[in-house]
């Protein structure tokens, strides 16, 4: 059976991931007019820029949907976001600022939950608005087929008939008006935005040019912290974790994790915390640029890693970072539920996150400027008395350290012999100043 359909399957049910925007509205209406039977599915991901979710299915019915459903994905989205924090599943960083993979997390939830809803309705053909140059076309493809092995894919933006008729926003707007719908295009921004309650992505258009900075972006989850006219008073916040799970903010517990994440977003957003500018590698290996917001994820991540460094030993922390980066890349590629990802998640949640219990108090200022004020945990292996410089009882003596250093003579001798061995083969050059062979100065190589 052909998985990807290049032309509209007339007379068949097609599920469309319906956002209510111009693109999916025009696509739904066009498919109905051309003889398909469209079903609309809208994911409630807690998008901060969406004002009325209930109105979206109503609009879909007006445009010709056979049926329209609103699927609440918020609980599952937050669960996956917390799992990503527990695992450090983030691989894109620039200058210490992290992209929290909020769009890939949203796609993992949307791609599985919407297709599951379609399957309940006997809909086995799926369409969405992803383009052939982006990451989402592959993410949705993978998650869709994982959820329904019989699924076929129809994307209007891969159909030449659709593109020839409605290939641009102007054409789509004119089409809607001609069909009796007073659909006015929204004010054209200098970039596009995609969001869920974990974070927002701003990209494309003017942001494709690296001389366009964060200053052209209007944040939807925070404040313009770079604008000195914006007053941002410092604020203290305490985050509590129990066995790797965030349970309280400023001493307040929450009835569910969705409410907790909303409050974390409000706190971090007041300061512009978690906003970053990243150049990344798409799945197809081409580089793209995005400006990201994730105030709540950033707040929880900072507190989690503070506890992590005080509780676990160096080798465990090293494995957390290495496996987290690997897992983050799998998540980015749409492989969050693949076996290799599940293996990494289980290991990190079982052996790392389970011990993360305690409280971290932060002072948030502007943007990503913050200080850690206090760290408290019953599981801390940080013991000041072990390394105190003050006179008093010690867990080890000067003689103990002399013995430990003496044992280092073995590998120091081995290393010295290797350095001179490298010099004999020409890999290192002799140095009159240091007494040891050195890597040749690259500046002198051509002289």
Swiss-Prot record:
Catalytic activity: L-citrulline + L-aspartate + ATP = 2-(N(omega)-L-arginino)succinate + AMP + diphosphate + H(+)
Enzyme class: ligase
Transmembrane segments: none
Annotated positions binding ATP: 17-25, 43, 129, 131, 136, 194
Enzyme Commission number, as recorded: 6.3.4.5
GO biological process: one example: argininosuccinate metabolic process
InterPro entries for this protein: Arg_succ_synth_type2_subfam, Arginosuc_syn_C, Arginosuc_syn_N, Arginosuc_synth, Arginosuc_synth_CS, Arginosuc_synth_type_1_subfam, AS_cat/multimer_dom_body, AS_multimer_C_tail
Keyword annotations from UniProtKB, A to Z: Amino-acid biosynthesis, Arginine biosynthesis, ATP-binding, Cytoplasm, Ligase, Nucleotide-binding
Cell membrane recorded as keyword: no
Pathway stated in the Swiss-Prot or TrEMBL entry: Amino-acid biosynthesis; L-arginine biosynthesis; L-arginine from L-ornithine and carbamoyl phosphate: step 2/3
Gene3D superfamilies xrefs: 1.10.287.400, Argininosuccinate synthetase, chain A, domain 2 (3.90.1260.10), HUPs (3.40.50.620)
UniProt cross-references to NCBIfam families, sorted A to Z: argG, PRK05370.1
Quaternary structure and partners: Homotetramer.
PANTHER family assigned: ARGININOSUCCINATE SYNTHASE
Protein name: Argininosuccinate synthase
Protein source organism: Shigella flexneri
């Amino acid at each position: 059976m052909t998985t990807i359909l290049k032309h509209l399957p007339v007379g068949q049910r097609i599920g469309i991931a319906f956002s209510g925007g111009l693109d999916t509205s025009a696509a739904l209406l066009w498919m109905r007019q051309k003889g398909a039977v469209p079903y609309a599915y809208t994911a409630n991901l807690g998008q901060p820029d969406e004002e009325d979710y209930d109105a979206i299915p109503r609009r879909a019915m007006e445009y010709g949907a056979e049926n329209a459903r609103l699927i609440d994905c918020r609980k599952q989205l937050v669960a996956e976001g917390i799992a990503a924090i527990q695992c450090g599943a983030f691989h894109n960083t620039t200058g210490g600022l992290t992209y929290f993979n909020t769009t890939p997390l949203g796609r993992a939830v949307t791609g599985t939950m919407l297709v599951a809803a379609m399957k309940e309705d006997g809909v086995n053909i799926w369409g969405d608005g992803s383009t052939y140059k982006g990451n989402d076309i592959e993410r949705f493809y993978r998650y869709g087929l994982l959820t329904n092995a019989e699924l076929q894919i129809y994307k209007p933006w891969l159909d030449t008939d659709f593109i020839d008729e409605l290939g641009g926003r102007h054409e789509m707007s004119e089409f809607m008006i001609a069909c009796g719908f007073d659909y006015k295009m929204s004010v054209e921004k200098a970039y596009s935005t995609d969001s869920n309650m974990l974070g927002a992505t701003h990209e494309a258009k003017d942001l494709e040019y690296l001389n366009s900075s964060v200053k052209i972006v209007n944040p939807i989850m925070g404040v313009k912290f770079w604008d000195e006219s914006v007053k941002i008073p410092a604020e203290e916040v305490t985050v509590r974790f129990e066995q790797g799970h965030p349970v309280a903010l400023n001493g307040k517990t929450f009835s569910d994790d969705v409410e907790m994440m909303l409050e974390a977003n409000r706190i971090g957003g007041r300061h512009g915390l978690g906003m970053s500018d990243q150049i990344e590698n798409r799945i197809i290996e081409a580089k793209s640029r995005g400006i990201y917001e994730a105030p709540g994820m950033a707040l929880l991540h900072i507190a989690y890693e503070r506890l992590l460094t005080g509780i676990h030993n160096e080798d465990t922390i090293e494995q957390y970072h290495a496996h987290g980066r690997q897992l983050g890349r799998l998540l980015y590629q749409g492989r969050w539920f693949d076996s290799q990802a599940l293996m990494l998640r289980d290991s990190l949640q079982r052996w790392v996150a389970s011990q993360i219990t305690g409280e971290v108090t932060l002072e948030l200022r502007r943007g990503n400027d913050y200080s850690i004020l206090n760290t408290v945990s019953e599981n801390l292996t940080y013991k000041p008395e072990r390394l105190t410089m003050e006179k008093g009882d010690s867990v080890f003596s000067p003689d103990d350290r002399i013995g430990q250093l003496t044992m280092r003579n073995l590998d120091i001798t081995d290393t010295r012999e290797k350095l001179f061995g490298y010099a004999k083969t020409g890999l290192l050059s002799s140095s009159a100043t240091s007494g040891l062979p050195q890597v040749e100065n690259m500046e002198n190589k051509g002289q």
